[in-house]
């Protein structure tokens, strides 16, 4: 009896396809315990997405935690020998705090880890598997890559104080050029250095073209080395890497990743469905001299693909209008100017008219 995949949810379909993909590439399934000793997460807290975990005292008196991360457990037990590369894949649930609900939630992850002798070829093979994982979803997807060495090299070249970096990185993650520049100047950087930081936000686009643009902005060897590694990756991927994007402003989880990082997106899903990269520093805490790279797919996000469209997207041929309530004063003027600059200006200036509502029928935008 044959079972059609179409009868399963998007997440279930992905599970079947990814399992076949990973096992075909030589990865062995890792089965993690639901609980780990809390001491593991306490010691490696800075490598976790969030320091909050659910703990309990087990029957043997030990303090344990409901697993918030799979990679730590694999890194602890892998212990690859010198020159050996161990490859694992997993299909597990982790428990983490939700920023939206401010409660703990279970997150269904499926991913893989390559640990030990990770060279340029192994790194390219993992990125190729990430691209194939996205392609297995049968929907439009895109993979963005970056390199932590380019960003940290710039911060070092500009002599940004360690205590000031967290604030600057927050604005960089938020893609807020104005606040990033202001914070850089407040830190004591000059206009040229501030411009170099905000310039990171412009280093985003097709991999090849953005590499060329980034080379012209390099200030140190660390940045040039990072770009060379990305060039080697592009060459190794060849046609498989077509459509890959480069975003050198990517600054997520810098405590965790130390080199290549990548993020996958799916059309119709607002958050990333895939995250991964190099985490050599973490791996070397368990096995000196070893390197590691891996990624995880967030299968819960895929269920959005099966959710019905919101009413505004079910209107057939009718136009969907964007209604914007502008605040009074300079804040409203600034917001309108930004929107107008993006092509959403009204047919008449809302400041010069007595009308309470102005609109642009072509852009389907209305201001109050």
Describe every region a protein language model picked out.
Residues 316-368:
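N-terminal hydrophobic or amphipathic helices and topogenic motifs
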Residues 32-51, 146-156, 250-259:
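Beta-rich nucleic-acid/ligand-interaction surfaces
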Residues 1-4, 216-219, 268, 357-364:
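Short, basic, glycine/proline-bearing loop/turn elements
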Residues 1-67, 124, 128, 355:
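TRNA-binding/sensing appendages of the translation machinery
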Residues 7-25, 36-37, 69-82, 86-140, ...:
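Positively charged, Gly/Ser-enriched RNA/tRNA-binding surfaces
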Residues 142-146, 325:
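Short internal beta-strands
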Residues 51-58, 160-182, 189, 266:
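Acidic, His- and aromatic-enriched active-site or binding-groove loops in soluble protein domains
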Residues 27-32, 243-244, 342-349:
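Short secondary-structure junctions
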